[in-house]
């Protein structure tokens, strides 16, 4: 068999291998909300988020996290949603407080790595 006939297969394997992140690259990726503290985020969430979610979901504030049409699918979307809610409710949280809330929600419900 000619080596030229194997060339497309070799190229395909090389391309697929290059597209897969190495274990080292995955291990070096920063954790989402690395600057957030879930212990500081919980009381902020309890103070401002729970009541609004409960009103929107018939008294069950946690239902927002388990609904089928879940909006948040990535850490960036979670951070954006927390920022959006902060602006809509006018809570006045600073970006570091938003990250604390996102860290709490991630630990409690989302579990992004």
Q: What is each PLM-predicted segment?
A:
Residues 41, 45-56, 101, 105:
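The canonical Cys-X-X-Cys-His
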Residues 91-113:
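C-terminal capping alpha-helices of c-type cytochrome domains
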Residues 38-42, 54-87:
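Gly/Gly-Pro-rich "capping" loops immediately C-terminal to redox-active cysteine motifs
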Residues 22-44:
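Electrostatic cytochrome c docking/interface patches
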Residues 8-18:
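Bacterial N-terminal signal peptides
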Residues 1-6:
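Positively charged n-region of N-terminal signal peptides that target proteins for export
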Residues 46, 75-83, 98-102, 106:
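An amphipathic alpha-helix signature
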């Amino acid at each position: 068999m000619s080596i030229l006939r194997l060339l497309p297969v070799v190229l395909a394997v090389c391309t697929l291998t290059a597209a897969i992140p190495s274990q080292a690259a995955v291990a070096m990726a920063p954790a989402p909300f690395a600057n957030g503290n879930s212990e500081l985020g919980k009381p902020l969430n309890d103070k401002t988020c729970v009541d609004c979610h409960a009103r929107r979901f018939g008294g069950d504030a946690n239902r927002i996290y388990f609904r089928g049409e879940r909006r948040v699918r990535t850490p960036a979307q979670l951070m954006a949603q927390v920022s959006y809610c902060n602006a809509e409710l006018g809570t006045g949280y600073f970006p570091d407080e938003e990250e604390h809330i996102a860290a709490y929600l991630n630990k409690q419900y989302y579990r992004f790595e």
